[in-house]
Curated annotation (Swiss-Prot):
UniProt cross-references to SUPFAM superfamilies, sorted A to Z: Lumazine synthase
GO CC terms: cytosol; riboflavin synthase complex
Organism: Moorella thermoacetica (strain ATCC 39073 / JCM 9320)
Pfam families in the cross-refs: DMRL_synthase
Domain of life of the native organism: Bacteria
This protein's name: 6,7-dimethyl-8-ribityllumazine synthase
Length: 155
């Protein structure tokens, strides 16, 4: 019979880093509220949660890398990149996505992608707690599950 390994949705005993982009703060603050709500509902100690605000999404991967190196069980990355009239959206969204994945792979720490990439403000608002749930909440749930899975795998 195979040995099944799964992470539980439990925040107790875990330390979380959260990186939040200040750009589009009217969206990202809702993502942060969602992430904190999920962690709180699942028993995370508020004193074991550190939040780093960064100017924009492009600064998220480097800050996540610094957090991953400091002993967090998981790092949650939150931001909102909204398409405009120039190709800036594609550049930022692609590089931030690659950067977050690279930090996770290089550090061995779950670094969770909780960014909204949207065509317009309405889509971003929907994904930050209205019609389409809250991507910050979802990212925190993933962070807890992955951190606990890694603890199971380390046994």
């Amino acid at each position: 019979m195979p040995n099944i390994m799964e992470g539980q949705l439990e925040g107790r005993g875990l330390k979380f880093g959260i990186v939040v982009s200040r750009f589009n703060e009217f969206i990202t603050s809702r993502l942060l509220d969602g992430a904190l709500d999920a962690l709180n509902r699942h028993g995370a100690d508020p004193g074991a949660i550190d939040i780093a605000w960064v100017p924009g999404a492009f600064e998220i991967p480097l800050t996540a890398q610094k957090m991953a190196a400091r002993g967090y069980d998981a790092v949650i990355c939150l931001g909102a990149v909204i398409r405009g009239a120039t190709p800036h959206f594609e550049y930022v969204a692609a590089e931030v996505t690659k950067g977050i994945a690279q930090v996770s792979l290089n550090s061995g720490v779950p670094v969770i992608y909780g960014l909204i990439t949207a065509d317009n403000i309405e889509q971003a608002i929907e994904r930050a707690g209205t019609k389409a749930g809250n991507k910050g909440f979802d990212a925190a749930m993933t962070a807890m599950e992955m951190a606990n899975l890694f603890k199971v795998m380390a046994r």
